[in-house]
């Protein structure tokens, strides 16, 4: 049986300021760096065959903390990147609500219907990431 552990990156400087980041490169905050180290320690007694991350720096930095503890390398799979929020990236909740009234509520209540302005749909995100996970599982290297 294959067991997959999905880990979210540590807090970023945009998380701190309430900004949407998606596919934009945003650094981990001081707290996020500490969270990455604590997450790595959670894996101390767990055997891992591999560590896979998206290419976003915040995800890589978090994954590298686990890899360092396990003396392993991190494999990069671009398809695992976060949703591309398009025009929303870098904006706060308030800025988005001002520019696109009602869209945030729509995102939380009917994400399957939402197409982000100049961004990715949740259906596209799902297709991309599910395909990547299937490929990882099906390659047979445990």
Where in the sequence are the language-model features?
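Active-site-adjacent alpha-helix immediately C-terminal to a catalytic or transition-state-stabilizing loop
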Residues: 1, 13, 60, 68-69, ...
């Amino acid at each position: 049986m294959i067991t997959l552990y999905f880990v979210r990156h540590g807090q970023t400087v945009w998380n701190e300021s309430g900004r949407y980041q998606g596919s934009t490169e945003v650094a981990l905050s001081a707290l996020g760096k500490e969270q990455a180290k604590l997450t790595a320690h959670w894996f101390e007694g767990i055997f891992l065959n591999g560590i896979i991350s998206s290419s976003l720096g915040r995800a890589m930095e978090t994954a590298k903390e686990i890899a360092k503890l396990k003396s392993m390398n991190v494999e990069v799979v671009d398809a695992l990147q976060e949703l591309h929020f398009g025009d929303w990236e870098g904006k706060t909740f308030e800025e988005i609500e001002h520019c696109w009234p009602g869209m945030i509520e729509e995102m939380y209540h009917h994400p399957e219907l939402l197409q982000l302005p100049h961004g990715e749909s949740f259906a596209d995100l799902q297709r991309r990431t599910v395909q990547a996970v299937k490929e990882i599982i099906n390659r047979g290297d445990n």
